[in-house]
Amino acid sequence: MAVDEEKNGRTATATVLVASDDSNNTPSIINGTSDGGKDDVYEVDDADPANLSLLQSIKRFPRVVAYILAACPGILLYGFDMVIVSTLTAMPEFQHDFGEVHRGKPIIPSGWLGIWTAAPSLGNIAGAAVAGWVCDRFGRRMSLMLGAVISAVAIAVCFASAFSADIEVRRGIFLLGKLMEGFAAGQVVCTVQIYTSEIVTRALRGSSQALLPMMTMTGQLIGALVVFACLSIKGRRGYLIAVASQWAFSALLFGIAIFIPESPPHLIRVGQIDAARKAQRRLHRKEVDTDKMVDKISEILEQERETMKRLGSQVRFIDCFRGVDLRRTIIVLVCHMMPQNFGLGLLSNASYFAQTVGIKPYVSVLLLEVGIAVGLLANIISVWTLSVAKRRPLMLWTLSFTGVAWAAMGISGCFDSPVTKWWTAASMIIIIFVCGNGVWPASVLATAETSSLRLRGRTQAVGWAVHGVYACIFAVVLPFIYNTDKGNLGAKTGFVFLALCIFSLGLIWWLVPEMGGRSAAELDLLFEHKVPTRDFLKWSVEKSNLKPSTTPAAGAGVSVSAAPAVVGEDEKKKSSEHVEVVTQ
């Protein structure tokens, strides 16, 4: 329904909120028109972008898809870095050069294993924190290029560590390299998520964010395959080849960062409107009304700026923890906890963990490869799953099943049987498939779509920093739980993750709402009016806590309203009255 009112020779600006009792049809908040739920930012014809199928979306926005895929080497680098410590420590030659003999077998001491495993996460914390500032100050492309350069230097440090004569020096230099590489990976993956969330259309939002776990698993698979291929190489040359292979990702990422267009929302935020229009045109085909898209993004950002001016605040990290944005930040942080809570840290270290339950080194690396391949398959399926399924139920159901699988593994560890090690291996493969097609990509999507556009860079930086802290805690603690020279829990470690799954179910149930199909403007309105978590899906104007005064009109309720969530100041000045129309 379009509402145009001629009054004294000029057109009044109307905000139209269409309410429906159907929980699947959410109201649209637009300027001057009602489109039944469409988002003006991505609208070029009468089809609703939010309701397009995955294939239709790819056909309609092929360039957006191409640029999202082009940014993926940054995630590959992150995934490779995540798995490289666990796979290197499973190599006998690496254990010989960096470990010690315990009960006649070479092992990596729990202390060093813990700190090496934690090093990438520690680096992620600093890298993510810096990414938010670099992205806002110098742009998303510059942040990617800087991360690629730091990564290349870090790989060189890890490579050089093998040539020291003193084992403690070798361990220390390797630690420094992993810290630096973790910094680069944290900066890069945070930047990639910011970039893709800003250029993607609403119809592709779920599928695009599912690429993060999928490409993470791909990076892990590449790392595991490289190490597996190097197992038969004698001497240090085997693991040095594995380390050096990471340079390929750094070089590829640097080249791609030069080529891709800058994020239009970032350019608009820093006042480069003409550059934003050029970047937006590169993201879409000629028939797409990119100027309309840029105008809509500008409008949303301006409205957010006006809101914060009234609160007397500028864009700072502290703003993420104030007012309405506090709730949004908490949701982002909770979702960043999910990967460690369902067991990703242990699954990433499966090649070493499997050896503690009696599986031989060669088979343990093969197990890791199978697990990663299964997880990758699940992540590929999740690209479709997130385009059709609701996020919140998907997280709850897959977490519940995962808890049962961890419990079964823990129970098997209570019995001294040859079956235990194979049951443990099977349980881990089942868990990564279930989570890879459920809670993992769904939680990643929630971290990307929850924050406001204005604070997206800062909120993502805070989220990835907490992600790194949390992963670091698990990296340090887990070896003391399962390693043979400490806790020696083995398969009974499953009980630990059963408890974490139950804890996560509670967090999601109480805190994480269903945000599927909502535009940035709609999410702003939902959070601004403090809609309860479990009411997001069924929210409508009639059930909201907006209290406008009403004036009867033929066939509709008409009310004079205060400034709406997405109407810019310039539009409000064009009209002597602001009309809010609600169909009954």
Task: List PLM regions with ranges.
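Alpha-helical transmembrane bundle of multi-pass membrane proteins
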Residues: A2-R281, R305-Q584
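PAS/GAF/H-NOX family sensory domains and closely associated sensor/linker modules
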Residues: K286-V288, M515
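Short, well-structured alpha-helical segments
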Residues: T290-R305
